[in-house]
């Protein structure tokens, strides 16, 4: 989840703020502070799992306030703040929780300025896709907060780019350019487009050389897979979206491992030792080839492949040409795409 940074003008905005605005600003500041602390923790080389997310006091205060009658705008701010603390705090939430918030907090509520990414988090956890899409569309158009509208346009751009929906991503980019020219979201969208083109379908895959994770004396390179179909999988054990893809990858491996097909998972974990314990879990053996990418997203390999986020799957044909990427290789579409090239 991408969380917005604090506005430089925060102290000015706080002056004379109404109760709902004050709650929004306070929650925004608290979440940003903890996220920055987490990033510093990771940058220092400390294990991600050792970081303590603790919003106990904030959640207790919110519960106390929600137990009393509140103006609707204050209630909206409290509910979104509560969602933010629980999501960022890595609490497991049931779908009913997201449904209840959708029913209680309008899509265009200013409270979503606490962190616009909570809107996409909510939408991803709603059971009905049409309801989720409608809720996001309403917020994207009607939110009174410019940064919320810009964020949602950028997310629409990213989703359409991954889905190769050219008409939609071009429209979203144009809206960012005309309506939010000075926003960081426009800069992010332009950067994503530039990086995306590095692995466009039809071009040769960038060359690489990496030591095998299981046998450091062995080396993987694009040349070593020549003549085979290769699914390159940029991932990490800490990446929840990567973990969600693993059942589909195991299914694909079982189906196609005997059809001149290889998978090479390239880890962005903090250290190589993080991977073996994860693979010892019965549900995630990942019985294919593995390598560790030193430097992760900042590595030359990540730059060559234009990695903006993970998971990032890329299918390379036996000649070394990229034939499919991103959404074509995720979820149930992975097997469908592989059947297209390798047969059923």
Residues covered by each model-derived region:
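Sec-dependent N-terminal signal peptides
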Residues: 3-13
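Helix-turn-helix repeat elements of alpha-solenoid scaffolds
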Residues: 49-62, 88-100, 124-135, 165-169
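N-proximal helix/coil linker or "cap" segments that precede and/or mark the start of modular domains
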Residues: 152, 162-216, 223-226, 277-280
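Short solvent-exposed coil/turn linkers within tandem alpha-helical repeat scaffolds
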Residues: 67-78, 85-95, 104-118, 125-130, ...
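Thiol/disulfide oxidoreductase modules built on the thioredoxin-like
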Residues: 284-286, 293-339
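Conserved redox-active cysteine motifs that mediate thiol-disulfide chemistry
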Residues: 226, 234-251
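Structural microenvironment flanking redox-active thiols in thiol-disulfide oxidoreductases
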Residues: 244-284, 294-303, 336-337
